[in-house]
Amino acid sequence: MAVKIRLKRMGQKKAPFYRVIVADSRSPRDGKFIAEIGTYDPTQEPSAFNVDEEAAKKWLADGAQPTETINRLFKKAGIVK
């Protein structure tokens, strides 16, 4: 089972809010997930990115692949180099 760390869209139309989740790569974007490890709100100034660092590092160590966007956010937060 290929596991990915990715964003799940929430919020209203034209007001996105995302949850950072760990999910099987074959499940739909807003479908079933394994764990929720944080949130991302791009509408705030500056953007609010909150994530459980320990959980993120654990999932990365276990082989979960972050998406491009999550990788960029992790680098900005100092979780990944």
UniProtKB/Swiss-Prot annotation:
<dbReference type="GO" id="GO:0015935">
    <property type="term" value="C:small ribosomal subunit"/>
</dbReference>
<dbReference type="GO" id="GO:0003735">
    <property type="term" value="F:structural constituent of ribosome"/>
</dbReference>
<comment type="similarity">
    <text>Belongs to the bacterial ribosomal protein bS16 family.</text>
</comment>
<dbReference type="InterPro" id="IPR023803">
    <property type="entry name" value="Ribosomal_bS16_dom_sf"/>
</dbReference>
<dbReference type="GO" id="GO:0005737">
    <property type="term" value="C:cytoplasm"/>
</dbReference>
<dbReference type="GO" id="GO:0006412">
    <property type="term" value="P:translation"/>
</dbReference>
<dbReference type="InterPro" id="IPR000307">
    <property type="entry name" value="Ribosomal_bS16"/>
</dbReference>
<dbReference type="Pfam" id="PF00886">
    <property type="entry name" value="Ribosomal_S16"/>
</dbReference>
<keyword id="KW-0687">Ribonucleoprotein</keyword>
<protein>
    <recommendedName>
        <fullName>Small ribosomal subunit protein bS16</fullName>
    </recommendedName>
</protein>
<keyword id="KW-0689">Ribosomal protein</keyword>
